[in-house]
Amino acid sequence: MPRPKKCRNLSCRAPYSMLKPNGIPSVELEKIHIDADEFEALNLGDVQKMSQLDAAASMGISRQTFGYLLASARKKVATAITQGHGLVLPQSTDTKREVL
């Protein structure tokens, strides 16, 4: 039986719903979905330059889980950029505390 999901503190909201290559209609693109917690990990780790320990504490998760989320998010972004896929960003109405 899988472990129950923990509540995670999310403070960042994506300004757009999707990023895609210019000139290609989105209906023709393969899409990669990035989760809200992966998006938050990218923001804290790469944009705000927080250490993994501090970023994990701010999200309310372990450092190892934060590392997994960050690696997964980076892979999805790199795949979308290098292979010309659309990147679907998370859209959430409540970014203070979300059950993921």
From Swiss-Prot:
Belongs to the UPF0251 family. This is UPF0251 protein swp_0615. It comes from Shewanella piezotolerans (strain WP3 / JCM 13877).
